Amino acid sequence: MVEEYSTEEEFLKKYDYKSFERPSVTVDIAVFGVLGEEVDSYRKDEKKSISLLLVKRGEHPFKGKWALPGGFLTENDESVEKCAEREVFSETNVKPRSLFPIGTFSAKGRDPRGWIISNAFVSVVSEDGVNAKGGDDAAEARWFKGNFTAVEDSEGKTKKLYRLSMTSGDTTLCALFEKIGCHFGRDEFFHEKAAK
């Protein structure tokens, strides 16, 4: 039987928030950098390239692995947006000019530390003059240039497989994606497996 309360104040005095499972809340930020390179032509055009800012984790779990900058919401953060700004700057020394929410990931079992709800953001910054460096629990921060190419079979025919390569110095991160369809003019991809 549900107990009835005459006022909200009475209800809140007896309310026990500990009786509900509480996940941790985090943010993850995909920071894209746009870099302009002058092209040698009479027009002095600029060739633009795009990179993704990644951090090498300095602590467990996944110590030594490359990841998006991010971290846990604390009591000092006013919002997940403020948390995202704080985490990007503390881990990379890069100040995002704007943050756009792109999704929330809440499935249990995604993180070995427990049930974590992650709020994902994207930010685009000019890479010119930005010195990314690791800080806080990030051992290192680097810009990785992206390349998305179709995978050809032995006969030179393009399959529905695509390779995403992210490169910084002597480090290359790769993944294979399969094109699974086109709906309403938009291609859909499925992450196949890590590529070597």
Give the label of every model feature segment.
Residues 1-196:
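N-terminal leader/linker segments that precede catalytic domains of diphosphate-processing enzymes
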